[in-house]
Amino acid sequence: KGYRLMPITLKNLLVTIFSFTVFIVGSIILTTIGFLLLTIGGKSEKNKLKFHTYLCNTFRLLVKAIPLVDCHLHNTTHEDFSNPGIIISNHQSHLDLMYTLMLNPKIIWLTNKWVWNCPFYGNIIRFAEFYPVSEGLDDKCVNLLKGAIERGYSILIFPEGTRSEDCSILHFYQGAFHLAN
């Protein structure tokens, strides 16, 4: 803890700058699309699905655009997300979200409050109907999520609530299991 595992090189610095630029441009584009589709166009189910599709496709492009990061999808269970469900995943890096949400447009993520309020992508999170659960699952949130499941959306939960500094698996909060019931 406290020491870099990799030295900073010009190559790493350029890759980081490029990746962050792609991220910022993608955030601006998705925020604009969300505003046009869901604020001006109205929050119809059709527009919500369109926005989720743009989000999913943007993540697919971003994953391919990040230099030095390979993405290989191994769908050994042949999951096609034709039925909604609860997706429980551990959370090791910022890339986890992109890799998970690129799988299907009908995925809604439970998030922390700081992500909900993030200046870079908070609007995208709100347009996509991702829900903050930092304070736990209240009845209002559970009802919103039930409605999303009835509309065919799967719910993505990182039950640890945050990423660990050393990539170890942290304590699982009970909300994921409560929601699954």
Positions of the model-derived regions?
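Soluble catalytic domains of membrane acyltransferases
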Residues: D70-N181
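Short, Lys/Arg-enriched N-terminal segments with co-localized hydrophobic residues
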Residues: K1-M6
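A transmembrane-helix-recognition feature enriched in membrane-embedded lipid enzymes
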Residues: P7-H72, N123
